[in-house]
Regions:
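Surface-exposed extracellular loop regions of Gram-negative outer-membrane beta-barrel proteins
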Residues: 1, 32-38, 45-68, 74-78, ...
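Transmembrane beta-strands of outer-membrane beta-barrel pores
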Residues: 1, 50-53, 57, 81-87, ...
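Flexible glycine-rich, low-complexity coil/linker segments exposed to the extracellular/periplasmic environment
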Residues: 7-45, 100-157, 314-317, 321-328, ...
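Conserved C-terminal beta-signal and adjacent last beta-strands/turns
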Residues: 47-50, 54, 64-66, 75, ...
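Residue-level signature of outer-membrane beta-barrel architecture
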Residues: 63, 67-69, 171, 175-177, ...
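Short loop/turn motifs that connect adjacent beta-strands in outer-membrane beta-barrel proteins
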Residues: 68-75, 179-180, 234, 292, ...
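Outer-membrane beta-barrel signature, preferentially recognizing the C-terminal barrel domain
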Residues: 154, 158-167, 216, 245-304, ...
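Gram-negative outer-membrane beta-barrel transporters
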Residues: 301-304, 313, 321-419
């Protein structure tokens, strides 16, 4: 993201009326004598430019082997090495015009009204007048005759360099206990090595410095066991036990600092994070129809240790500064998940042969989760907490038509709300609101040696917003609308 520029204007001591009659759409309007429309009473608050460079590299090597035995038994084994690197470099400058009056006069001559009566959340929200992007982009910021510039040290505190190498090996034995019972057992060993360097920020001296290179390594043994019972050709029963691992992401681990000066907010990394491990038990039964389709039901249980969630504190003192909002990822405790999953797929040929080209696919999952050993300060004794990131209800449905190269599909997806971020009390907990998505796509393919496909797709037909709320469903914290996205084109395969 090169040359990312922002101009902030301000007008102090303005008074507003806050309308909370509809908490989902709160609205602030200026009182008499106050305004939120850019005019010559405003002054320059901040003029900045940021250069952000993120470099990522993934290197992978793997080798897999298989030894067949009598009676259909097989031994599989192999190894894999994955090395990932990620470097984030931000260079951030604040500029001060030498003649601020002339700069303001020129800025007010180069504005654009971004208001839109069709604004998706509600037409009452009008964004108003801004300096145009053409004007902002054309500013000669590095001309010393026009601007003074200063590197903003606290913005550099989010820089980091991270290295992760995962070396793994596995062995798996597939055996046939009887003609109808199969057993697959295995063990995967993963060795994770981490090295990262972040930044520190000294607010008193207004300087940043590199942290010492920190290293961490750990080994995980991940067993698995799967039993498959072919009751008959159409009915299958499966049971399994697996242990899985989820590693923290780079931005959570490295000792970096991200500061939003305008909002007095800070987010810091946590080098002490442990990976999240899960013990998984699954039991399912599948019945396959004579025609294309199946009906399936399953139950699952997961015991999760050291799940990670962002902890948010308000008016928090850190390194001598009091921040309005302080965020840090933490291992918040353990959790138990118990759930049921149902799925159904079938074409409509069983109704009439002519309907074989039309079909339906649907799934539904219910998940009950409870947190144990919750370790946020001041909330240790809370009960009945759901695991963050785990919606209780999810459902998917799809109606499709497939015939003679023509494919048409309409899909619907639903997920209920869930805790996304946890604060110092339940009042500050942030929830990701429920979502309803509907998509449609169609394609037509023809040709033998050279295949040509015309396709079209439309996503988010219901204009589902990304929405967060705080504590209760009506208390909007953030809402973003993206509208319907339509894409069409042609593909040719030789």
């Amino acid at each position: 993201r090169p040359n990312e520029r922002y101009i902030d204007f301000q007008l102090k001591k303005q008074k507003f009326d806050i309308d909370l009659s509809n908490e989902r759409q709160p609205f602030a309007s200026p009182k008499d004598g106050s305004t939120m429309t850019l005019n010559d009473e405003f002054s320059l608050k901040e003029l900045t430019e940021q250069q952000e460079d993120i470099k990522e590299q993934d290197l992978k090597f793997s080798a897999n082997f298989k030894l067949p035995f009598k009676n259909g038994n097989k031994l599989k084994f192999g190894a894999k090495v994955v090395r990932k690197t990620k470097d984030k470099t931000v260079d951030f400058y604040e500029y001060s015009p030498l003649d601020e009056d002339a700069f303001m006069e020129n800025s007010l001559k180069n504005t654009v009204d971004q208001s839109n009566k069709h604004f998706m959340p509600n037409s009452k929200y009008q964004t108003g007048i801004y300096a145009s992007k053409e004007y902002t982009g054309a500013l000669d910021l590095n001309n010393p005759a026009l601007f003074e510039k200063e590197q903003v040290q606290e913005e550099l505190a989010g820089n980091f360099e991270a290295r992760e190498t995962v070396s793994s090996g596995y062995v798996r034995f597939d055996s046939k206990i009887t003609d109808r019972i199969e057993l697959m057992s295995g063990l995967r060993i993963e060795n994770t090595n981490l090295a990262y360097t972040g930044r520190t920020y000294d607010a008193d001296e207004d300087i940043t410095g590199k942290t010492e290179r920190q290293r961490n390594s750990y080994i995980n043994f991940l067993p698995s066991l799967l039993v498959k019972w072919n009751v008959n050709d159409d009915f299958k029963v499966r049971g399994s036990f697996t242990q899985t691992l989820s590693r923290p992401k780079y931005s959570a681990l490295v000792p970096s600092v991200n500061i939003k000066r305008s909002d007095n907010e800070i987010t810091i990394g946590n080098p002490e994070l442990k990976p999240t491990t899960s013990y998984n038990f699954d039991l399912s039964a599948d019945y396959y129809f004579r025609s294309i389709g199946l009906v399936s039901a399953g139950i699952f249980y997961k015991k999760i240790d050291d799940f990670i969630v962002d902890q948010v504190s308000t008016n928090y003192e850190y390194q001598g500064n009091v921040y309005t909002r302080f965020t840090q990822p933490k291992n918040a405790g353990n959790a138990n998940l118990l759930g049921v999953e149902l799925s159904y797929q079938r074409d409509f040929g069983f109704i009439a042969p002519a309907l074989k080209c039309i079909g339906f696919y649907g799934t539904y999952t219910y998940t009950h989760s409870r947190v144990e050993d919750f370790n946020f300060e001041g909330r240790e004794n809370e009960e009945g907490l759901s695991m963050p990131g785990s919606p209780a209800h999810t459902a998917n449905a799809s109606l499709y038509f497939e015939k003679a190269g023509l494919n048409i599909r309409v899909s619907y997806n639903f997920a209920s709300d869930f805790i996304d971020e946890m604060g110092e009390s339940t009042f500050y907990d942030r929830y990701y609101d429920k979502v309803n998505y509907m998509d449609a796509n169609a394609s037509y393919t023809f040709g033998k040696k050279i295949k040509t496909t015309f396709y079209a797709e439309a996503n988010n037909l219901l204009n589902q917003p990304l929405r967060y709320y705080q504590g209760t469903k009506d208390r909007t914290m953030q809402a973003e609308y993206y509208g319907v996205k339509v894409n069409a084109g042609v593909k040719i395969n030789f």
